[in-house]
């Protein structure tokens, strides 16, 4: 299912679920991943407000970057919408970069870019989406189903702030044919 931003969409905070919600105006409601304790006071006290042109532009910018990874359209929409919520409504976070190896490959990623990091303890590479770019650290959302860290488990779209020197550009794996190396 592919969703398209619409001027009928409305943001609101649902106190029963303690989350920012987006009424998609077609009988569907999107519930963000982020609990009230992670959100700004503005998000928690907001009245219903429209999904703005800036929100739509950000949604499409995020979605454009996802073309390089193989995930279902429903998950793309979920990641993009959670990215918009993270950018607009999340409280600032402190970096938690000790989980990841330093590379100094990237000085500053692009908003929405799919990046990879390498786990310090086992060398596994993990995909994230950059929701908000900072000068030295960026807020990222997990762009795969699950990540087991030494002291916690992250799920799809969970946020973490990572120092930019830990981020690497994601390079899509290439498929070689059996004749790919023939000279």
UniProtKB/Swiss-Prot annotation:
Disulfide bridges in this chain: none
Subcellular compartments: Cytoplasm
Signal peptide positions (record): none
GO biological process: division septum assembly; FtsZ-dependent cytokinesis
Keyword Nuclease recorded: no
Gene Ontology cellular component annotations, sorted alphabetically: cytoplasm
Function: Contributes to the efficiency of the cell division process by stabilizing the polymeric form of the cell division protein FtsZ. Acts by promoting interactions between FtsZ protofilaments and suppressing the GTPase activity of FtsZ.
Subunit structure comment from the entry: Interacts directly with FtsZ.
Family: Belongs to the ZapC family.
Listed HAMAP family: ZapC (MF_00906)
Name of the protein this chain belongs to: Cell division protein ZapC
Species in which this protein is naturally found: Xenorhabdus bovienii (strain SS-2004) (Xenorhabdus nematophila subsp. bovienii)
